[in-house]
Curated annotation (Swiss-Prot):
InterPro entries reported in the protein's UniProt record: AKR, Aldo/ket_reductase_CS, NADP_OxRdtase_dom, NADP_OxRdtase_dom_sf
Identification of the protein by name: Uncharacterized oxidoreductase ZK1290.5
UniProt record similarity statement: Belongs to the aldo/keto reductase family.
GO (cellular component) term, any one: cytosol
Residues that, per the record, bind substrate: H106
Active site: Y49
Species name: Caenorhabditis elegans
Amino acid sequence: MIPTTVLSNNVEMPLIGLGTTHSGGYYHDAVLHSIKKCGYRLIDTAKRYGVEKQLGIAVKNCSVPREEMFLSTKLWPVDCGDEVYNAFQTSCEKLQTDYLDMYMIHMPQLPDWIVNQKETKEKTWRQMELLYEDEHVRSIGVSNYSIEDLDELLEFASILPHANQVELHPWFHQADLKNYCDELGILTMGYCPLAKGKYLEDETLCKIASKYQKSPAQICLRWSIQQNVPTVPKSTDCRRLKENTNVFDFELSAEDMNTLNSFSSQNRKIVDLSNICQKMSLPDGYKLNGRVFGVPEEDETIPKSCSKCAQKQNVPLPVCI
């Protein structure tokens, strides 16, 4: 069982979850393997990724009771204001659930065509609060919010976000933002915890990994959870899916934590959100490029390719099938 942390409203959240961003495609077999064989219970997704329907099928067919799962998805900014409830309902229908464990606003930015930006942000958050008050969701949160974005939210929020999900790894650990969230009782969640693998061959990181007889990726994940930061690495590889959960049998020393913290002086942010407003009107899941593999054939409503098709097309499929 993957250990949990506790949100400010006493809701428990697993410290390691499965990320499902649309980059790299969707592999149904990998999702099922993560739940059934590796013990994942936190599934983190977003309307934007275009895989909610596929994940709903996986959760339905995984044989794990819904109440043992922690489903988290996100509101895309085009569904702001009065559209929040409809967007929530659509996500729930696709995920085949009547409630969410966490519902987050994906971005602080709104589309350029919104005239009254601050008023719309306030209305959007109020709709999120109503979902929580009416017990449609167990917690509400935000994603990619800076200190300035949170300050703006605090001007009108009756209920503070239970979490703020941001890019967070040793090369970009946003200590000031995390400390600010800690002061407010907002849990910091991390995405992109391995920096997309760009620096896993770093000499210092590899020395630390050798010391603990762990992989560099496990050291990065341990660095996150040791700060009480739930994190959601994405993988479609069976071995790595399991490896990512084997980070609870050791503890990094204070010296090694400080060494890893020092990597952030390089300020190597991986995810570029600078032009996000120009991309808001693109279709959900546009990065999938049709790479949806292994969804059961009886679910004809979902555009997909089976695992055999993936192999015929020479698509890498490093999962147990």
